[in-house]
Amino acid sequence: VHSRALLALEARPVCVEVHLANGLPSFTLVGLADTEVKEARERVRSAIQNAGLEFPANKRITVNLAPADLPKDSGRFDLPIALGILAASGQIDGGKLVGYEFAGELSLGGDLRPVRGSLAMSLAIARPAHGTPQVLPRLVLPEGSAQEAALVPQAKVYRAQHLLDVVQQF
């Protein structure tokens, strides 16, 4: 699942990888995540359960935010982490997430809250690497963040108010 981390005024790509394994149940975040990102464990678990979806509590869950050397802060990774868990557990089709980038903080009930830097994310995807023709990724963001990201003319931005709004599309 793809997202972006803010580094000064840049929005650098981040890949959220999720692995579910048998063993002692746990939920581990790796990849230079700060305290606020590590708190995502409880927000994501509650949001998935309160949305009526199944949280794989009997599994060992490992979430990697790559690249590891890029600092990650804020709750912006809640939505991509939740989607990664839902895809890894077979509740949504992970293949349908290709071509999208996600960001959003989840409330315990599954509502999406705006995140900082959505304009930077939108600008970053609107400028593909020099000489590389490509299809621009589409952004899925909370309502307030989506309005800001939509200021970039070539950006394709989708708004969501709740985790279920996103899940129903994939």
Language-model-derived ranges and their functions:
Residues 1-170:
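Peripheral, non-AAA+ core regions of ATP-driven protein-machinery
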